[in-house]
C-alpha cells in the first residue's frame, strides 16, 4: 500500500500546558476545525473527546495522553492536506511522567498559556522537559476573553520566567469581553472569525486605527527576528528592502526549528477564535519528521555501536513504545511512534530491549478513545498495537534483521508510598493483577511487597497520583482497597570517606569451609553525578582476590544498598573501591565473598558519618493578599524555606521549599486558612539531609 500523505506533510505535535490553561478545550477545537468532531465537546459538561477516562471527566483534568490523528488544509484552504498527529498531555504535576513520555516522541509542541494566569510553575516543568528533548515549539495564549487577560504580559513572562525568546506572530484586538480577533503581523491584516458558524469561516480586514501604531512596532520586531536567520536577509533588511511574506515565513520557520525563537499566537478556544490561525502556525513553523535530526540508538551487536535511523520508509523498521494502556474491550494497547520503515498488521518484530519477538496482531489509529483499524504504519506515524505480549514503556520495536535499541526514556523515582490491602480476602489475587497492570502502564508508579510486614506497598509521584491509582483499581478492576497512611521515601547516604575497612567471612567446621576476605574504601559521591547513585571500582592488584569473585563483592554491596543500616532505606550517592583481600584455594566461594563484602559495607557505613536524606518539594502557593502572612507562617511551621514571593493580578505567589513529610494534608489546611481561595502546586526538587531530631524519630519508628 502506498503512502497517502508525504512525510514532509506530517506534524507530530504535543499540546502542553498548565492545568486550567484551557488545553483540552483547545484540542477539542482543533478536532472540530479539522473536521473530526461534529459536535464540540466542552470540558465544563464532561463531554470532551480527549479526556476519555471517567475520572478525567469528573475531575476536569487530563490524566492520560491520548493520541489523535487529524487533517488540516489551512484556514483559507491554502495547503495540501497535512496529517497532524496530536498527543494531548496532562497539566497536573503528579502526571509529569506522561508529559515526559510524549515529549520523547514528538517533533514539535504547542504550549498553551492562560492570558490571565500566564506562565505557571507546571509550565516551567514542561518547558524544561521540552528543552531536554530539544522540541521546537510555538505558544498559544488562550482565554483572551477572560477578566484580566493581557497578551503582552504573558509574552513578557515567557521571556522572564522561561528564559525564552518570544516573538509575537499576532496581537490581540481588544481583551476580556471586548476581544474580537487578532492582527496577523506577517500579513498586517486583522482576522475576524465568523461567530455564526463557530469560527469556521473568517474575513481579513484592515487593522483598527487605534492599533495601527502598536501593530507596526511589533511587525518590525517580527521582521527583524526573521532577518536574523541569515546574513543575506539581514543585509536586505538593513538596506531598507521589503522582505516578502514567503521569505519571512521561511526565516521564522528556520529559527523555530533551531529553537532560537518561540512564535506566540493568541485567541480564545472557548469563543472559537484563534485556534484556526494557531493550526496554520503549526503547519508553517513546526517540523515534519524529516526536519528533525535522525533518532540515535545503539546496534544490538554486543559492542553497543552507535547508529541512527532516518525518517524514511526505505530504512529498516524501528519504533518506540511510549505508552501502554488497558482498553476495556481489547486488552493491552501499546502506543508507538514509527521512526523509520514500514510495518504491517500480522508482521513479527523484535523487541530489542528484551530480545523477544512480538507479533503485531492488529494496528489501530486512535481518535481519543475511538479506534480505526489500519493495515500498515510508516515512518512518522503514531499508532497503537493490540496483542503485544511483553512490551514496556520505552522499549524499541524493530526489524528482526536490523536490530537497534533506540534511546531509552528516563523515569523519576517515586517520592511517596502507601500500604494498600483489599477489603475482602477474595480480592487479594485481583488486586495483585490490577496493580501489576497499572504498573505496566505507568513507569513512575511502583508496587512491591514489604518483606517485614508482608503488606503491599504502592509508590508514586504525589498524593493525587496514588489516589487515582486506588480509584482506577475500584472502577476498572472492581477491587476495593483500604489505604494506609502515606510514607515518605527517605534515602541514606554518607558524608565522609573511610579507608581500609575489612570484611571477613570465615567458617571452618569439618568438610569444606567458607572463606572470603575483602578490604574496601568507601566515599560519598556528588549527588546526581552518577545516574545509578553508586560506583564500584576494582583496584585489586596481583590477583589477591581472583577475578571470578569480584562480581560477587559488587553484588554483596549492591544488596546492602537496597536497605541501608540506618533505617532500612535505599543508600544513594556512594562509591566503593575494592583494593585488597585474600582467598582460600578450597574454601572460597562467591557466597563467602558476598557475605564478606556485606560485612565490610555495614562496618564502613557506620564510620562514614551516615545521614538520612528526605525529599524536599518545590512548593508554589497562590493566595489572596490578605492571607499571605498566614500562608507563610504555616509553611515556616512545616520547616519550609521561603524562596521569594511576587504580586500577581489574582493575589500573591509564594515560592518555598518544604520537606515532603510536612506536606501531608496540606490541601485541607490551605483551604481552611484561605476559605478555599488559594491553590498550590508541588513537585519533587531534591534530597537533603534530614535534621537530627527528624532522622532520630524516623529511625526509631523503623525500629532500628
Curated annotation (Swiss-Prot):
Family: Belongs to the TRAFAC class translation factor GTPase superfamily. Classic translation factor GTPase family. EF-G/EF-2 subfamily.
Function summary: Catalyzes the GTP-dependent ribosomal translocation step during translation elongation. During this step, the ribosome changes from the pre-translocational (PRE) to the post-translocational (POST) state as the newly formed A-site-bound peptidyl-tRNA and P-site-bound deacylated tRNA move to the P and E sites, respectively. Catalyzes the coordinated movement of the two tRNA molecules, the mRNA and conformational changes in the ribosome.
Annotated protein name in UniProt: Elongation factor G
Binding site for GTP: 17-24, 88-92, 142-145
Taxonomic placement: Bacteria, Pseudomonadati, Pseudomonadota, Gammaproteobacteria, Enterobacterales
InterPro entries according to UniProt: EFG_II, EFG_III, EFG_III/V, EFG_IV, EFG_V, EFG_V-like, EFTu-like_2, G_TR_CS
NCBIfam families associated with the record: EF-G, PRK12740.1-5, small_GTP
Domain tr-type G: 8-290
Domain of life: Bacteria
